[in-house]
């Protein structure tokens, strides 16, 4: 896992240079939004179950996918979907705090699409649920933090597409 600070420092170090103005500006921006990210993470952590419940209600609960014959029919499959959404929310929050999506590649996306395809998990419905989670989260944390979180939800969706 990498964070915004490590990414900037590593880039300069690889080149054997001091931080340039662009690097300093990236760090300044990261630190200026630090309080916003921490407050958003606290709010998401305190409301994670509600975020997931509302996202499922918006995207999956009344669709064909939850009816007999659907890919989320049976309690076990439904529970696995809820577990995965919780996982995406948690790791998107970690990424938002770090200001870097690398943890999503390392811990979420590597091999996920292939696994879902082999298990018959509908990727379109998964993406729809993540987008619903993005909307619910943005309404909870406000537009600025919601936009920041949206970057990481979109990153997950892009990785699944």
From Swiss-Prot:
Gene3D superfamilies: Phycocyanins
Compartment(s) of residence: Plastid, Chloroplast thylakoid membrane
Gene Ontology cellular component annotations, sorted alphabetically: chloroplast thylakoid membrane; phycobilisome
Record's subunit section: Heterodimer of an alpha and a beta chain.
PANTHER family reported in the protein's UniProt record: ALLOPHYCOCYANIN BETA CHAIN, PHYCOBILISOME 32.1 KDA LINKER POLYPEPTIDE, PHYCOCYANIN-ASSOCIATED, ROD 2-RELATED
Family statement: Belongs to the phycobiliprotein family.
Protein's name in the database: Allophycocyanin beta chain
Organism: Cyanidium caldarium (Red alga)
């Amino acid at each position: 896992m990498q964070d915004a600070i490590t990414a900037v420092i590593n880039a300069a170090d690889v080149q054997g240079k001091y931080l340039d103005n662009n690097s300093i500006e990236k760090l300044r921006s990261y630190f200026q939004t630090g309080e916003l990210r921490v407050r958003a993470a606290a709010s998401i952590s305190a409301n994670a179950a509600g975020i997931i419940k509302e996202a499922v209600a918006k995207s999956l609960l009344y669709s064909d996918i939850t009816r007999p014959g659907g890919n989320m029919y049976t309690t076990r499959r439904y529970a696995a979907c809820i577990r995965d959404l919780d996982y995406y929310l948690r790791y998107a929050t970690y990424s938002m705090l770090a200001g870097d999506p690398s943890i999503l590649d390392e811990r979420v996306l590597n091999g996920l699409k292939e696994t879902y395809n082999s298990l018959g998990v509908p990727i379109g419905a998964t993406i729809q649920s993540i987008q619903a989670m993005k909307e619910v989260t943005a309404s909870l944390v406000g537009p600025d933090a919601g936009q920041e979180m949206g970057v990481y939800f979109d990153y997950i969706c892009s990785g699944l597409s």
